[in-house]
Regions:
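Secretory targeting signals
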Residues: 1-3, 7
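N-terminal export signals
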Residues: 7-28
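C-terminal segment of N-terminal export signals and the immediately downstream linker at the start
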Residues: 25-64
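Acidic/histidine-rich catalytic cores of soluble enzymes
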Residues: 54-56, 92-93, 187-293
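Short, acidic/polar
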Residues: 71-86, 144-155, 252-260
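Aromatic/hydrophobic pocket-lining residues that form the small-molecule binding cavity
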Residues: 77, 110, 146-150, 179-182, ...
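Structural motif corresponding to the early beta-alpha repeats
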Residues: 86-187, 194-199, 225, 235-243, ...
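C-terminal helical cap(s) of enzyme catalytic domains, especially alpha/beta-barrels
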Residues: 316-331
Length: 333
């Protein structure tokens, strides 16, 4: 995770933003039925061909891969679908609410975004939601406010034709207290999401959530067909030596392969995190052969989202290298 994103999450982690219902009158690209099979991807995902040489999954593009040009105003959120399709040949996108955080209830804006999606033949898959409070807070008032803060993103996802929102399950307290609170918070949000046909999924994203066994236990506790996980290949740092969840060097890291394996039974999406590559085009920090085998063995046939986050390569080059790696390894595992 980049410094900018860490700062953003710290600044917005406790904000209460209220909620409201967005009209769904405009036809959306993509369906909205929540998944009823927690061992697979979203029920509306179109499985990729599994014949020899073909991928067992489909590739999507996580908007965070382009966070640098987005923060620098070199790229506008409304142009993301076009860029994904034109520059990278990717027809499925994953948004980050940070790049249109004040537009969740702006129907005119959402309509324009959806129009650009449809004009370019791009499908909206999910919205990653940060800065809307702690769904795992042991404080009842804080947790319930966080649940309500996410309602508007469920509504926006419905409008845009997404099937999923990605949330965080952070909270301050003991492992047991935060786990109990997260089960309650996610369960409540999951109920709201189910009414709209939207899945609610949690990423391993720092703190207790980067402990695969802990997050898997939360999923078992929630026990709802539309509440699941978004395993991220690289976000398994549980503790850092700086202040806050995302500052400083990682001093306690969960095994990424073990964690991914534990989270895959509940996965409704996967994030292919990459930072750097060797001369052969392999990801340096993650063995993609090993990781994609774990994903495949879990029976997953949905979307694997490219999330390049490195500093040595440009976002454009990093996205292309991650895509090439997924295509090469995905065809042979």
């Amino acid at each position: 995770m980049s410094t900018n994103r860490r700062r953003f999450l710290q600044q917005l982690g406790g904000l209460a933003a209220g909620f409201g219902v967005v009209s769904t009158g405009l036809a959306a690209c993509g369906g909205n039925e929540p998944s009823s099979d927690t061992t697979k991807a979203d029920s509306v995902s179109t499985p990729a061909a599994t014949a020899a040489g073909k991928l067992f999954f489909e590739i999507s593009l996580a908007q965070w891969s382009l966070h640098k040009p987005l923060w620098e105003k070199k790229l506008d959120n409304l142009d993301f679908p076009l860029v994904a399709k034109r520059d990278y040949g990717i027809s499925v996108v994953e948004y980050v609410n940070q790049f249109f955080k004040d537009k969740a209830k702006d129907e005119k804006y959402l309509a324009e975004l959806l129009k650009r999606c449809n004009d370019n033949g791009v499908k909206n898959h999910l919205i990653m939601c940060d800065g809307e409070g702690s769904l795992g807070s042991p404080n009842d008032k804080e947790r319930l406010q966080a649940v309500e803060n996410h309602y508007k993103w469920v509504d926006a996802a419905k409008y845009l034709g997404c099937v999923t929102i990605r949330v965080n399950a952070h909270g301050e307290g003991s492992r047991e207290d935060v786990q109990k609170a997260a089960i309650d918070g996610l369960g409540r949000l999951g109920e709201y999401g189910a009414k709209a046909g939207i899945n609610v999924i949690v990423e391993n994203h720092g703190g207790y959530t980067s402990d695969g066994a802990w997050l898997a236990a939360v999923m078992k506790g929630v026990n709802k067909p539309n509440v699941g996980t978004l395993p991220d290949f690289g976000n398994f740092c549980i503790k850092r030596d700086g202040k806050g969840m995302f500052d400083g060097k990682c001093v306690e890291e969960y095994d990424r392969y073990k964690g991914t394996q534990e989270l895959m039974p509940y996965a409704k999406g996967v994030s292919a995190k990459a930072y750097d590559f060797d001369a052969q085009g392999n990801c340096i920090e993650t063995d993609y052969n090993k990781m994609l085998k774990i994903v495949k063995d879990a029976g997953f046939t949905g979307y694997i989202g490219i999330e390049f986050e490195g500093d040595k390569l440009s976002p454009e080059e990093g996205i292309k290298k991650t895509k090439a790696l997924l295509e090469r390894v995905g065809a042979i595992v």
